[in-house]
From Swiss-Prot:
This is Probable chemoreceptor glutamine deamidase CheD 1. PANTHER family: CHEMORECEPTOR GLUTAMINE DEAMIDASE CHED-RELATED. It catalyses: L-glutaminyl-[protein] + H2O = L-glutamyl-[protein] + NH4(+). Belongs to the CheD family. CDD domains: CheD (cd16352).
């Protein structure tokens, strides 16, 4: 049984669904805590529209199909085209998203440390961003049209005040300084705090979805 990722945006909200056959496998929804249907997704107009689209009973130009998903582990980055990109379990780490909307080519990095690496290690902010840009351009992205979004950098050791332990702040500063130095426009960011995050990039509309691991809050940026 084949599975498909669908992005839909209508007057109710926005959502990404992974549907296998007629079964909802997982979803990322802008309604989040305000969802009027709570756990009863069967009543959701977004999901019903997506299923009708798959069944061929209700063509909808507002629905877009995504070509799968890629997830970057700690110190890794992933590049793709028209794919959902994810970094999960961010504490002090930063999820950095680069995209060229004109080609649909995008990348995501799971940055662990600030600065650059002489050995090309992509766990460092500057090195990861440089390599992502290079690979995206090789894939067909236009350097002048690449933009950025990023999130993370929580202070996970909140009981410690030494500056050297504030790695989340240092990561966020390093990412921002690198992007500015490379003239890459920053369209959105969500950094700091004391709560971990999961970060997802939706190439269908260029949104960064930030899910707070403890609070359950979801942001679409």
């Amino acid at each position: 049984m084949s599975s498909v990722f669908l992005f839909i945006s209508n007057e109710s909200g926005k959502a990404i669904f992974l549907i296998s056959g007629d079964v909802l496998v997982k979803s990322f929804c802008s309604l989040s805590d305000t969802c009027p249907f709570q756990d009863s997704c069967r009543s959701c107009s977004l999901l019903n529209a997506a299923k009708n689209y798959l069944a061929g009973t209700a063509p909808d130009s507002r629905i877009k199909t995504l070509d799968g998903e890629l997830s970057a582990g700690i110190g890794e980055y992933k590049i793709g085209k028209n794919v959902l990109l994810k970094v999960m379990g961010l504490g002090s780490c930063i999820g950095v998203i680069l995209s060229d909307v004109s080609t649909g080519i995008c990348g995501i990095a799971h940055v662990l440390l600030p600065g650059a690496s002489d050995r090309g290690e992509t766990k460092y902010a500057e090195t990861a961003i440089e390599k992502m840009v290079e690979d995206m351009v090789k894939m067909g992205a236009r350097r002048s049209r690449i933009t950025a979004k990023f999130a993370g950098g929580a202070q996970v050791f909140k009981h410690m005040s030494l500056d050297i332990l504030k790695i989340g702040d240092r990561n966020a500063i390093s990412v921002e300084e690198t992007l500015i130095k490379k003239n890459i426009p920053i369209l959105a960011k969500d950094v700091g705090g004391e709560v971990g995050r999961n970060v997802i990039f939706n190439p269908a509309d260029g949104s960064m979805i930030v899910k707070y691991t403890a609070k359950g809050e979801v942001l679409w940026l």
